[in-house]
Amino acid sequence: MSKRDYYEVLGVSKDVSPQELKKAYRKVAMKYHPDRNSDDPNSEDKFKEASEAYEVLSDAQKRAAYDQYGHAGVDGNAGMGGGAGAGNFSDIFGDVFGDIFGGGGGRRRGGPSRGSDLRYTLDLSLEDAVKGTTVKIRVPTLVSCKPCGGSGAKPGTSPQTCTTCGGHGQVRMQQGFFSVQQTCPNCRGQGKMITDPCKECHGHGRVEETKTLSVKVPPGVDTGDRIRLAGEGEAGADGGPAGDLYVQVDVQDHAFFQREGRNLYCEVPISLFDACLGGELEVPTLDGRVKLKIPAETQTGKLFRLRGKGVTPVRGGAAGDLMCRVIIETPVNLTKKQKELLEELKASMKGEKNSPKQESWFEGMKNFFGDLKM
């Protein structure tokens, strides 16, 4: 009986890459796998045909011979009649599908495994984040069971080798002309069985516990930064190493300061008279109060920089600055006399160039409305 073209069997072109070839074989093999088509008597033949095609085309030398001479160039090496045999199909299937079915170089037997990492969110004030601190935290976790030493077996006893898999954690299942490795259903891949479990951990080898830990927070941390505590995660299974604990920083809002990188920002209200005549006032910083000089004729929104009064980055470098934005406060609750004095001041300023921005704005409005055609 004549054989179909191998490229046609896998539905690929003759210039297909090795990666695309493997992908095509996976698709065809999954489609015609006997376990998925128990009601189709032809599926096994189609599966064998696809495996034979892939066995040839995935080998550079065999593929070159096939491209030059066709089936005649590989008949001595491919298929069930040559050196490949059923064992080769098993190897091919395990290589391509090992991560799905546990065959070939895929999963291995169970054994000690690393514990899971944990995450803890630490709320910090801005002061503690900038200056650094040490805090105590309580973390629920899994720790190794002390009575059994993490084995899960009753003290004085030991886990027994699984009789189903012989301690390998895997069993080989014969599927027609090939075999597939699967996780042992008896020991679930552990390779051993606990016949007399520990009463403390009920055979799990680990117990729940809330640990109290001391966390040293370095100066300069910010929201999103993580502090790693090695080995403070969950205990590993079967004596495996513990995972790590990652403490994630969340800096709370401050009543006065806002942080942007290494700089701090704040708003400072000043009186109308200090803005006009100039003055000096105290402003708070994270290191205490400092004096800020306000020059005469200061406009609202102006930024004043206090160098070095910001944040020192956690990874080193120069400290940032404190940026003070002044906000001019309009007087309220004026007395009759105060209002009269302000009226006199207002009258005395008519015709003077005391409000250049306002005058520029009014001039712009005149030009704007003058250009409008009503």
Curated annotation (Swiss-Prot):
The keyword Thylakoid appears for this protein: no
Function according to Swiss-Prot or TrEMBL: Participates actively in the response to hyperosmotic and heat shock by preventing the aggregation of stress-denatured proteins and by disaggregating proteins, also in an autonomous, DnaK-independent fashion. Unfolded proteins bind initially to DnaJ; upon interaction with the DnaJ-bound protein, DnaK hydrolyzes its bound ATP, resulting in the formation of a stable complex. GrpE releases ADP from DnaK; ATP binding to DnaK triggers the release of the substrate protein, thus completing the reaction cycle.
Positions with a binding annotation for Zn(2+) 2: 162, 165, 184, 187
PANTHER family from the UniProt entry: CHAPERONE PROTEIN DNAJ (PTHR43096:SF48), DNAJ HOMOLOG 1, MITOCHONDRIAL-RELATED (PTHR43096)
UniProt cross-references to InterPro entries, sorted A to Z: DnaJ (IPR012724), DnaJ_C (IPR002939), DnaJ_domain (IPR001623), DnaJ_domain_CS (IPR018253), HSP40/DnaJ_pept-bd (IPR008971), HSP_DnaJ_Cys-rich_dom (IPR001305), HSP_DnaJ_Cys-rich_dom_sf (IPR036410), J_dom_sf (IPR036869)
Matches recorded under NCBIfam families: DnaJ_bact, PRK10767.1
Subcellular location: Cytoplasm
Protein family per UniProt: Belongs to the DnaJ family.
SUPFAM superfamilies attached to this UniProt entry: Chaperone J-domain (SSF46565), DnaJ/Hsp40 cysteine-rich domain (SSF57938), HSP40/DnaJ peptide-binding domain (SSF49493)
GO molecular function annotations of the record: ATP binding; heat shock protein binding; unfolded protein binding; zinc ion binding
Name this protein carries in UniProt: Chaperone protein DnaJ
Zn finger (CR-type) start-end: 132-210
Naturally occurring in which organism (per UniProt): Saccharophagus degradans (strain 2-40 / ATCC 43961 / DSM 17024)
Every J domain range: 5-70
Cofactor note: Binds 2 Zn(2+) ions per monomer.
Keywords of the record: Chaperone, Cytoplasm, DNA replication, Metal-binding, Repeat, Stress response, Zinc, Zinc-finger
Cofactor(s) needed for function: Zn(2+)
Entry-linked HAMAP family: DnaJ
